[in-house]
């Protein structure tokens, strides 16, 4: 018998503390009256708690976040907030009021400027900026939550939860708390009496401690909807190069598209330009993707075999219900999204990730963290890296081999698709990422790089494509990036003879090298030129949010 055994160590402190707090709340069942939520939170929380708050990419537990911001800072303070997405003003009100102190997150979007300011003012401490699945993983290691605040559509009085198309992060967040003696509170839009009144059970009631009916339906952002009317000729040109110079060249059959008008253009060119090239059935068959409305024409044209989704998208519910062969749906017909599983699929099961960024340096390192803007990364670092644990082969993965060797491995295609200048004439290509200086001023141990250059296989701009996986040295890699960087300082740093040699060797291609005339990149190539066209393609099943309606 060792010394620890003789001291009578207590092995159930977390469980005992949870039971104490539940007794303090003194609720007769699992349903918290809407108007009592603030006082209940003050009984269930303690200073310094680790609190998961569902902020997702789209779905927001906004009633819980608003009520959390109303607790008494004298009672509840210095919380350690763990949030996949920081997207609402009250998320940061928590820090201004002293209710919260530390933040671990993945993405901030609209709150990126304010996070940076709060950090500068000393009101907020950053634990780390994560990719989504990294943050979920830490909930099961060193960030076990004391409390999880999540959102669903419906619940019964036993806590059974229907999360439906917007399941997103919820299962990963709930399980970490429910099975390590954390407290789980779910806000719902509607309370029903019995399980049989739920469309299906996405999370069992035994995982949920309390449910509360919100004062209004939870906020959800149509984050991945892009109006085709805003797609420019530059986007179309880049999309043509992507389809012919990357997708067809490497036989990309499974993929993820990042958010943006450039990838929306690719989706809308598949039924037109892709058809002209005879590529249907050869590329773009399997997708890990939010249900982009701009993918509807490709689905209807027979290009797409399957789509697994990170989250839902407002207006796509009935279209998805009518296409169960394509999407993952439950017996009730509604989609089941799951960001954790979709991120895993995007890491190990797809041939390619293609997405944009705000800054790229000379070696193709990229970041969305810039001076005064701490936006985070979302899923890009996970989707946009080559997982060395992968063992199954596909044509595209094998196509990245540069020499025959049975001990070599293939590689995921990671494509950075950017215009050489951002809006406001800010160069995308820079000598040094702002992230380096941000790390110094913020006391971060490492620069917040989104995608490291050694994972990037291609850089695609309106100038052309750099096939970086074929670079034979860092110096050549830098020259290849410069060759497609336009008139930025990076681009002006390479001479015409070097560019000509790179084009001659096929390591860099311009549109003309692919047989693409720039004058052919017109909006007439788009399978849909407006949101109304997407509705027509869907046979009226797509119901776009009001802000995207022009009729």
Ranges and model annotations:
Residues 1-551:
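Conserved alpha/beta enzyme-core scaffold
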């Amino acid at each position: 018998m060792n010394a620890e055994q003789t001291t009578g160590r207590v092995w159930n402190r977390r469980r005992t503390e949870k039971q104490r707090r539940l007794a303090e709340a003194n609720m007769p069942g699992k349903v918290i009256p809407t108007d009592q939520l603030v006082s209940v939170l003050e009984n269930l929380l303690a200073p310094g708690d680790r609190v998961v708050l569902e902020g997702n990419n789209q779905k927001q537990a906004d009633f819980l976040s608003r009520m959390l911001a109303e607790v008494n800072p004298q009672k509840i303070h210095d919380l350690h907030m763990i949030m996949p997405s920081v997207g609402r003003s009250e998320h940061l009100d928590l820090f201004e009021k002293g209710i919260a102190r530390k933040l671990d997150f993945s993405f901030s979007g609209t709150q990126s400027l304010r996070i940076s300011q709060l950090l500068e003012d000393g009101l907020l401490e950053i634990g780390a900026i994560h990719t989504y699945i990294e943050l979920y993983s830490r909930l099961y290691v060193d960030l076990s939550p004391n409390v999880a605040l999540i959102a669903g559509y419906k619940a019964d009085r036993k806590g059974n939860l229907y999360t439906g198309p917007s399941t997103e992060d919820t299962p990963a967040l709930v399980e970490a708390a429910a099975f390590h003696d954390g407290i789980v509170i779910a806000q719902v839009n509607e309370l029903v009496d019995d399980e049989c009144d739920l469309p299906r059970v996405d999370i069992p009631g035994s995982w949920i401690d309390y449910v509360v009916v919100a004062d209004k339906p939870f906020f959800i952002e149509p984050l991945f909807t892009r109006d085709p009317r805003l797609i420019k000729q530059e986007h179309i040109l880049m999309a043509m190069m992507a389809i012919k110079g990357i997708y067809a060249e490497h036989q990309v059959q499974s993929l993820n598209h990042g958010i943006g008008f450039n990838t929306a253009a690719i989706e809308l060119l598949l039924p037109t330009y892709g058809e002209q090239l005879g590529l249907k059935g050869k590329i773009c068959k399997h997708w890990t993707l939010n249900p982009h409305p701009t993918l509807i024409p490709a689905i209807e044209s027979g290009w797409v075999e399957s789509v697994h989704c990170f989250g839902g998208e407002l207006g796509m519910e009935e279209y998805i219900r009518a296409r169960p062969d394509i999407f993952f749906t439950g017996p009730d017909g509604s989609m089941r999204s799951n960001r954790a599983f979709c991120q895993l699929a995007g890491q190990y099961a797809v041939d390619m990730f293609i997405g944009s960024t705000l800054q790229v340096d000379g070696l193709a390192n990229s970041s969305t963290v810039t001076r005064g803007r701490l936006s985070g990364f979302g899923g890009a670092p996970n989707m946009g890296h080559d997982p060395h644990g992968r063992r199954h082969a596909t044509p595209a993965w094998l196509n990245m081999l540069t020499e025959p060797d049975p001990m070599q491995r293939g590689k995921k295609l990671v494509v950075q698709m950017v215009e050489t200048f951002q809006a406001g004439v800010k160069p995308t290509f820079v000598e040094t990422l702002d992230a380096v200086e941000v790390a110094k001023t913020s006391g971060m141990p490492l620069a917040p790089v989104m995608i490291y250059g050694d994972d990037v296989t291609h850089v695609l701009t309106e100038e052309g494509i750099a096939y970086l996986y074929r670079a034979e040295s860092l110096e050549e890699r830098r020259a290849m990036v410069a060759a497609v960087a336009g008139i930025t300082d990076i681009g002006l740093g390479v001479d015409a003879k070097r560019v000509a040699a790179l084009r001659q060797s096929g390591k860099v291609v311009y549109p003309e090298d692919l047989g693409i005339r720039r004058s052919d990149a017109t909006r007439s190539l788009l399978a849909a030129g407006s949101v109304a066209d997407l509705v027509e393609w869907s046979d009226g099943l797509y119901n776009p949010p009001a802000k995207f309606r022009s009729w």
